Amino acid sequence: MASASRQILRAASRASTRTAFAPAASRGLAARTIAGRRFYSSSSEPAKASSSNLGWIAGALAAAAAGAGYWYTQNGGAATLTKPEFKDYQTVYNDIASRLEENPDYDDGSYGPVLVRLAWHASGTYDKETGTGGSNGATMRFSPEGGHGANAGLKAARDFLEPIKAKYPWITYSDLWILGGVCAIQEMLGPKIPYRPGRSDKDAAACTPDGRLPDAAQRQDHVRNIFYRMGFNDQEIVALAGAHALGRCHTDRSGFDGPWTFSPTVLTNDYFKLLLNEKWEYKKWDGPKQYVDSKTKSLMMLPADMCLIEDKKFKEWTKKYADDNDLFFKDFSAAVLKLFELGVPFAEGTENQRWIFKPTSE
């Protein structure tokens, strides 16, 4: 749980009226590590229950003694649920949030944004024409996909979640990575993101081809091609781009460098405000083409970011979100929900059975 003082500071950071170059008011549980050339931008299968009659009996007795509404088996000292419920996933959420709070040793003080990026990149490979890719499979565990340039640096996020997977072997990597993204968004004071489990893990044969994720060095034609392939429209593209309020780029991953906003641990509409209200110029350096703010030269925008104010249709939504954080949150939540569920063969009739997890700030 975050301390009361940190929660107050973070809430104040979001609620206060900011000048364009005000320093971040909060560092809390949120995080600042989105990197890799993206636009927003080796593990085993889950353990299975033992077939031992003795293990089954011991597990059943233990569950009965605990008053549990499900049975489990003992597998290497870890409980494997057969019918996990909302409360079980809330427990996993809470443990992810605790790890975010207890591990401030990553980029800018938290792993939050890199967890969002992991969930995003696991989902953003979807192709509606072939029905391949998406968050179902967690195929980034394997070298073909994990080694794609757009996924550089995401091993840190996958490794961060490994202790959670070991503690709760009943959750698939696919569901865990998305739950990690949901948790990170909410713990960084973003909107509530509805969640439903049901993803399964696949082997390396299901890895998607390289090139399905956005290239931040490109402009609106490329951006539309990538997102239209997944089934998004212009409004949803701009809403999803708002995730660039979080984290930063790294020269050793994407080649780009710097954060998009001054408060990269709190999700707000500042990204859109800065795009519209600040003057941007090409950065003078030996790296790939990117922009810096003319005043402080401490913020950056990528070519794919700039198309949100260069393209007439994109700019319309950029203005709307800059003017209305509540509207941004509403549309961002809906677009992220759609992204995280692309290509997942959920059981029929579960569309209205999504869960909302309680953040640690409540």
UniProtKB/Swiss-Prot annotation:
Gene Ontology biological-process entries: cellular response to oxidative stress; hydrogen peroxide catabolic process; response to reactive oxygen species
GO cellular component: mitochondrial intermembrane space; mitochondrial matrix
Record keywords: Heme, Iron, Metal-binding, Mitochondrion, Oxidoreductase, Peroxidase, Transit peptide
UniProt transit peptide range: 1-40
Coiled coil: none
Top EC class of this enzyme: oxidoreductase
Site residues (Transition state stabilizer), renumbered to this chain: 117
Taxonomic superkingdom: Eukaryota
Residues that, per the record, bind heme b: 244
Cofactor field: heme b
Cofactor: binding comment: Binds 1 heme b (iron(II)-protoporphyrin IX) group per subunit.
Active site: 121, 260
Pfam families attached to this UniProt entry: peroxidase (PF00141)
EC number annotated for this UniProt entry: 1.11.1.5
Catalysed reactions listed for this entry: 2 Fe(II)-[cytochrome c] + H2O2 + 2 H(+) = 2 Fe(III)-[cytochrome c] + 2 H2O
Function: Destroys radicals which are normally produced within the cells and which are toxic to biological systems.
Family of this protein: Belongs to the peroxidase family. Cytochrome c peroxidase subfamily.
Protein name: Cytochrome c peroxidase, mitochondrial
Record organism: Pyricularia oryzae (strain 70-15 / ATCC MYA-4617 / FGSC 8958)
